[in-house]
Every structure is written in structure tokens, then in C-alpha cells.
């Protein structure tokens, strides 16, 4: 298990063209990123559509690569993924997908600040893990309304996840106004050492490996994580050239919200304990996006502003712009840039061994998660989409009504304003993201 940055996860989401509200805890954010990333070749048998006109199917093969280069704690995430959608009738669509995160690299298992008398840098440990996730769902469409439901099961050596999601939407005013309401519920379990609830947080130990997890091993325990996610979206087309989207998202989290592998130095003598976070967290975000098509340039320009706040006192702001242009009828390109900034969590300190207020303890909690420190980041990137359209009787490659391929690249740089490893600035603050995807409809 390793924790990836919220911004890296957000970048990965954008690479795949999906917008989600991140509501996972620190221990599971890497899993969410894995859900969005995909790399390596996927082989899938493609079946010709049946002659019946009501039968429509599409296949998506996604590939992407996340790399966080570093001399001591580099990280690589690859994830083959495939999705199949079949419509046996004009009102029902069935979906199924599979993905497998393949994670490798090194991570510092001990966090200490400028005053720590412990060698933090050489504490990086190498790891490798694979996560498998299966999703099944359906969509019912009737006139101007639709209902979608899905279930996902994910498993890896030290984590189990069960989640369902439901969304409903409608459009009116000649389809110029669209409303969407979504709810997701997660029932997760994370493996930790077998400390008792009555044990003092300062005496709890971190995991050193996943051996024995989810077995009868008396040195291991399973902790629950409850996730509730809500989202409300309003999309409005004002003119043929201008449209906006307003999205409100909220999340409630309860349970073990730390990293079971990470220890924090909490005393001048070098005493260390398992990372200790509050068991409850509420999160909210409000985003506004506008898109305007300039006919003279044949280019669509977009702007996005997003504000984030949670009960751990983190306040984040995201600003993004992009431009999309058809170079040819079959080739579309997009360039974009994004800036993100956030404040620190209420209990954050780079060093928990000193005194208040510049450094030292922050109440009863301590953390080694850089995503709870004050930081900012910028992202630049782009993607290209190639589409080949066919028609009945003249299919692409003899089987597809439509075939498309997309390639994307993003560069992400993070500025950590108050996070060190034993007084040293981490060198893993750059992330590179590649994506490659194919879609066939038949």
C-alpha cells in the first residue's frame, strides 16, 4: 500500500476524461488513482454485433501510466483495463468492466521533520502489489430521464472494498437543462497491526508488510472504513456556443483514515508511533465550468473553478483552462493547464517533536501524509483523439460502426511548503502521466 497525492489522482482522472470527486481516505487514495489509471496491453475478444437492430455494443480498452521519479522513493503504477457495454433494447444498457492496478516502487515508512534524530531518508522500503477490481451495472433510459446503478468489488493483499453507486438524471427545456443526482456507498476494510482500541495511540505500531492480512493471524486486524459520497450537477446550454456546468459534491468518511504502514516520530528521543488521524471527516466541493465555442477559430475554450473544504480545516482551490480544436474531421486535439493550492490540516506539523507553534504537537493527532500539509501544484498537458466513422454495410475493419483512439500526456509539479523528510525536501514532487485508449462501437 502506498499513498498517492490527491492532485496526482485528480490529474489521472482528467487524463481519462472522467470527473469524479475524490472521497477516499489517505490509505485508499492510491487505490482510487489505480481505478483511473490504466497501462499495458489488454486483450479482449470482440464479438460481432447480432443482426438485430436493437442490439448495440461498445468496447473500451484503456491504458495509462503514472510515474513519480525519485532517487530513493520512485513510484510506478500501471493498470490494464477493459469495459463492455451492451444494449439489448433501446431502454436498457448493461455494463461490465475489469481493471488491475500494478504498483511498484519505494516509500518512506517513517516520517520525521527538521528536529528528528532519526535517519528518515534511508527508511524507504520497496514494495509491489496488485489490485483487482470488477464492476457491473445497468442504465435504464426512458424519454428524458435515466437511472444508473453499479457495484464494484476490489481486492488486494491489504485492502478489500465493496461499493455501490446510484445516479439519476433528467433533461428538459428542449434538452438545454440537465440535472444529475448521484450517491455512492463504500464498505471497505484495511489491514493493520492487531492493536486494541483501548491501546494508547502512541503505543500502536505500523505494518511492515501485508503477510497474514485477512487471515487468522493474531498479529493482524481488519479495520472498517465507511464512505458516503453525494453529488448534484446542473448542466445548462445557454446558446449554441456557450454552456455551463455547476457541480456540488460532498463526502462523509468514518473509520481508519490513516496509512497503516506509516510511522511518525513523536518525541525528541526518536519515539515513533503509527500515524494517528481523526476517525471522522466531512468533505465538500463546489465547481463551476464553462465552455465557449469560437466559430471563427473553430475552437472550444473552457474554464473551471473548484473550491474544496473539509472538517480537517483544509481549504483548496483549483483553476483550470483548456482549448480543444479539430485539426481534421477525424482528429481532435486538446491542450490544458491547471493550478491547485491548499492550506494545511488543523493538526498538521512537519515535526511533532518540537514546541508550538512553528512545529511540534497539534493536539492528539499526528500525520506523515504530505497531502495534509500546505501545498500547491501546476499541471500542463494535452491529448489527441482520432475517430473513424462507419455505417451499416460499410463498417470500419468490417465490424465497427465507430472506432476511436486517444493518447494523452500530463506533467504535474507539486510544491511542498511545509513538508520534509528529516529536514530534507523530498525529490518525488514530479509526476508524469501517459494515457492510451481505444473505443469500438458495433
Where are these regions (language model features)?
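Outer-membrane beta-barrel translocator domains and adjoining extracellular loop/strand segments
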Residues: 71-76, 97, 107-112, 152-154, ...
Amino acid at each position: 500500500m502506498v499513498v498517492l497525492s490527491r492532485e496526482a489522482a485528480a490529474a489521472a482522472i482528467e487524463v481519462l476524461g472522467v470527473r469524479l470527486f475524490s472521497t477516499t481516505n489517505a490509505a485508499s487514495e492510491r487505490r482510487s488513482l489505480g481505478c483511473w489509471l490504466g497501462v499495458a496491453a489488454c486483450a479482449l475478444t470482440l464479438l460481432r454485433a447480432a443482426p438485430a437492430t436493437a442490439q448495440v455494443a461498445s468496447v473500451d480498452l484503456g491504458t495509462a501510466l503514472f510515474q513519480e521519479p525519485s532517487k530513493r522513493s520512485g513510484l510506478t503504477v500501471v493498470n490494464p483495463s477493459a469495459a463492455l457495454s451492451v444494449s439489448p433494447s433501446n431502454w436498457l444498457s448493461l455494463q461490465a468492466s475489469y481493471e488491475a492496478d500494478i504498483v511498484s516502487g519505494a516509500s518512506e515508512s517513517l516520517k520525521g521533520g527538521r528536529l528528528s534524530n532519526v535517519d528518515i531518508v534511508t527508511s524507504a522500503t520497496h514494495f509491489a502489489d496488485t489490485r483487482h477490481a470488477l464492476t457491473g451495472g445497468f442504465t435504464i433510459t426512458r424519454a428524458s430521464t435515466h437511472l444508473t446503478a453499479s457495484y464494484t468489488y476490489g481486492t488486494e493483499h491489504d485492502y478489500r472494498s465493496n461499493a455501490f453507486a446510484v445516479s439519476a438524471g433528467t433533461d428538459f427545456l428542449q434538452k438545454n437543462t440537465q440535472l444529475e443526482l448521484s450517491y455512492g456507498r463504500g464498505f471497505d476494510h484495511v489491514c493493520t497491526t492487531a492493536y486494541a482500541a483501548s491501546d494508547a495511540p502512541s503505543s500502536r505500531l505500523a505494518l511492515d508488510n501485508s503477510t497474514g492480512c485477512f487471515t487468522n493471524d493474531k498479529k493482524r486486524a481488519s479495520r472498517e472504513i465507511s464512505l458516503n459520497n453525494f453529488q448534484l450537477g446542473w448542466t445548462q446550454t445557454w446558446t449554441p456556443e456557450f454552456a455551463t456546468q455547476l457541480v456540488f459534491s460532498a463526502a462523509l468518511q468514518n473509520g481508519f483514515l490513516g496509512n497503516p504502514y506509516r510511522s511518525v516520530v513523536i518525541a525528541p528521543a526518536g519515539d515513533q508511533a503509527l500515524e494517528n488521524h481523526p476517525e471522522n471527516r466531512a468533505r465538500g466541493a463546489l465547481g463551476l465550468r464553462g465552455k465557449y465555442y469560437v466559430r471563427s477559430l473553430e475552437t472550444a475554450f473552457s474554464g473551471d473553478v473548484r473550491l474544496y473544504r473539509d472538517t480537517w480545516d483544509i481549504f483548496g482551490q483549483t483553476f483550470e483552462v483548456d482549448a480543444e480544436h479539430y485539426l481534421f474531421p477525424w482528429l481532435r486535439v486538446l491542450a490544458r493547464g491547471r493550478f491547485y493550492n491548499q492550506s494545511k490540516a488543523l493538526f498538521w506539523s512537519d515535526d511533532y517533536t518540537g514546541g508550538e507553534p512553528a512545529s511540534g504537537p497539534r493536539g492528539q493527532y499526528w500525520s506523515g501524509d504530505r497531502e495534509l500539509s500546505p501545498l500547491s501544484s501546476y499541471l500542463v498537458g494535452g491529448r489527441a483523439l482520432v475517430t473513424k466513422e462507419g455505417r451499416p454495410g460499410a463498417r470500419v475493419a468490417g465490424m465497427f460502426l465507430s472506432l476511436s483512439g486517444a493518447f494523452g500526456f500530463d506533467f504535474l509539479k507539486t510544491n511542498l511548503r511545509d513538508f520534509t523528510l528529516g529536514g530534507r525536501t523530498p525529490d518525488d514532487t514530479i509526476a508524469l502521466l501517459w494515457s492510451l485508449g481505444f473505443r469500438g462501437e458495433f
